Each structure stands twice: as structure tokens, then as C-alpha cells.
Amino acid sequence: EMSRGLGDVYKRQYNSMPVQNWGPSIEGLDMSNIVTYVRPKTEMRGKWSEVPDDIKNTFERLGIPKAERASLAGVGAQYDSEVVYHNVKAEVAAQGVVYTDIESALNGPYAEMVRTHFMKLVPPTDHKFAALHGAVWSGGSFVYVPAGVSVEIPLQSYFRLNAPGAGQFEHTLIIVDKGAYLHFIEGCSAPKYNVANLHAGCVEIYVGENARVRYSTIENWSKNMYNLNTKRAKVEKGGTIEWVSGSFGSHTSCLYPMSILAGEGARMEFTGITFAGAGQDLDTGAKVVHAAPNTSSHITTKSIARDGGVSNFRSSVTVLPNATGSKSAVSCESLMLDDRSRSDTIPEMDIRCDAVDVGHEAKIGRISEEAVFYLMSRGLSEEDARALIVGGFAEPIAKELPVEYAVEMNNLIHLEMKGSIG
């Protein structure tokens, strides 16, 4: 079966490749204790009512039924290693939109499309954990939007790890054809266990000519999670990829969605926020390759660190020799809430073309005690005053999300400020 037939080859690649010598340490991740596959307690279900109560309760806490009532178009819920609930509303399916688990796609009429695109943007040779993903992947989603179709309501997918010492290696493959539009939302969470967990999923997005894709993520993994996810998009002529990313949980994160602007006039927008608390080392950012003329990219991030947390921003902008007339702007603002926390900005630029406009801006600061004093003079407690300031700092990110997800993000920020997320 596709990469599974190459599993031994990919395992050898994984074993032979070195661990990265930059960024956060992953020495605490003992791969000998990671279970690469955990079968859920239920077979595939098409209706919410058919899902067993214990799994249903897990997803209710994630808000899936509520989200469906809000008319979100599709739900794919990954509980440990397989999708156990997947549904696409009839009106979306009637547009010719395909949203299914990737194993079903491999056995259906779109099998050849999956095989043609699977792990082509993120080959197993890309890095050590891409090789591991290629060897042991299971579960995930396949989305295909036909040419000219605009999916007006978001598709969404949830990933939840429930087994201690488990690894989750889901693969999301999204293909949006010429002139089409899609908004895909990914939510991630996991309860806390004493054993380290690993998330090494993969997202591949193909944006057709003059198409537009928005990919939004709210990640709230538990504080024992190593989040080593890989996300990548290829954008054709006149197409647009928009990333909206919120990283709150995990013990360690290395997350840098990459966009390859392959066609003339292709665009990339990245908007992200990272919140690191005690014991967290979150290394996040974005990468872009300008591979065609008149392409543009705009990266805007906010980083927050408290209680000794580390929140680093890492960016990479590459402009190839043929990408004349291209523009790239990178902006990072960091807010440290105490003198024990750390926030660094690590930009990398590889410009191989003269006729381009590239810029980078970074700001690092602390909460103004004068602002806290003013808000307290208006009746707020010190805790509420600081939370309000941090919420205002994050507001440009929140406004890019659908309202229910913006509310969730603001709640996460308030919980993080109180140190009450496990």
C-alpha cells in the first residue's frame, strides 16, 4: 500500500538520519517507548449517534457537535491513530467536494490522485521525522475541491491523543483545483500523561491556479507532547495560501509551515501566535520559497512567554534567481511576561535575485507596568489587567479566526495566564 510498501526503506532512512542540531532539544523523547499505532475502540462511523459514549464524550469536550450545529461542513475526528467520525454535509458533497479519511480515498475513485500527490511535497528524505512518518503513518484526511467550486463553510478536523506513550502520524492531503476556495480548520488536543507523547503528522496542500486556501490551526497539546509536525503547500499561478496558526500546548514544538510559490503571482500569508509557559520550549515560525516572478509573502507572528517558558520565532525566506519582482515582509513581535522567560527571533534570508523587495522587522518587549497600573485604577485586578493586555496583543490573530475558534483561543490565553492548562 503506497508508502507502507516502502516502510522498511523509510525506517532505514529514519535510523540513518541525524537528529537536528539546532532548535529545541528532543533528548527527552525516548522513541523506544513510543507506540506508533493505537487502534481506537470503534470502527468507522458516519453518524454521531453511532459513536461509542466514551469517545463521544471525548469529542464533545472538543466541541464537535457544537461545531456541526454551527454548520461547519465536515468533521474528521482522529482519536489516537484512526478517524472514528467523519461526515460531510450533503450540500458540500453535491458540489463535488470530496472529504474523507485517507485510507478510504486510497480505495475509491480518487486513489490515483492520492498516490500521485502523497508525500511528494514532504518526501521521507526531508528530515528524520518525515522518514518516520513515511514508515508508520496512519489515519488522516483527504480533501479535493473541484475547479471553480467555492466551499463557503469550513471543513474541520480534530486530532486527539488519548494513550500514554503514543505517537500520532496522521497525513492530511488537500488538493484545491483551479479557481476554487477552501477553508480547512485543524484542532489538536491531548490529556496529560507522565509518559512523553509524539505527534509527527504531515500536511500537504496543493493550491491550483487562481485558487485560494486558508488553513487554520489551534494546537493545545498537553505539556508532555513533542510536536514535530510538518506542513507544506505548493501554490500555482495566481493562487493564494493563508496560514493561521495558534500554538499553545506541548512540551516541545518545532513547527514551520512552508509555502512554495511555484507560479507567477502566487501569494502566501502567514499569521501566527505562540504562547509558552513553564517547562515549554516552542520553536515556531514559517518558511517560504519564491520560485516564480511577482510572487509575494507576508509573515506576521506574535510570541508570548511566561514563567520561564521559551518562545522562539524562526523564519526562512528564499528567493530564487527567476523570482523577479517578488516581495516578502516578515514581522515578529514578542512579549515576555517576566524576567525568567526567553524569546528569540531567528530570521534566515537567502536572496538570489536583485529585483526584489524583502524586509524583516522584530520587536521584543515586556508588559508596561504603567498600563497595568492604569487598568487597576479603573477597577481591574492585577491578574485581569495583565490578561487584558495580553489579549489585546493577540487580537490581530484572533480576528483572523471564525468566531467560535477566536473565543477558544482567547479562553486558552486566559487559562495560560492563570497557569491552569495541564
Model-derived features with residue positions:
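Conserved beta-strand/loop scaffold segments within soluble protein domains that form the structured core
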Residues: 85-87, 91-380, 394-422
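Generic structural signal for well-ordered secondary structure
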Residues: 7, 27, 48-52, 136, ...
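Glycine-rich, N-terminal phosphate-binding loop and its surrounding beta-alpha-beta segment
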Residues: 17-95
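Residue-level detector of short coil/turn "hinge" positions at structural boundaries
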Residues: 19-21, 66, 99, 151, ...
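Single conserved hydrophobic/aromatic residue that forms the stacking wall/gate
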Residues: 1-6, 10
